[in-house]
Amino acid sequence: IGMVAECKDGYLVGDDGCKMHCFTRPGHYCASECSRVKGKDGYCYAWLACYCYNMPNWAPIWNSATNSCGKGK
């Protein structure tokens, strides 16, 4: 019997609701941050933010519909 695991890809978000920036970070930064949320891999994308692959569904990712970046808490 096989087990199906749901995974998603997307931009990591910080506590402030903004995409996790990587412009001034070392090359391995995004891959390390993605693995912290059990993602399989990640890189610094053209928007200069960390993009992760194969993260579990519970991991928070940036979504334009629910964007809270810069809106305060």
UniProtKB/Swiss-Prot annotation:
GO cellular component: extracellular region
Keyword match Signal: yes
Name of the protein in its database record: Toxin Td9
Stated role: Beta toxins bind voltage-independently at site-4 of sodium channels (Nav) and shift the voltage of activation toward more negative potentials thereby affecting sodium channel activation and promoting spontaneous and repetitive firing.
Family from the record: Belongs to the long (4 C-C) scorpion toxin superfamily. Sodium channel inhibitor family. Beta subfamily.
Residue span, LCN-type CS-alpha/beta domain: 8-70
Residues with Lysine amide modification: 71
Lineage: Eukaryota, Metazoa, Ecdysozoa, Arthropoda, Chelicerata
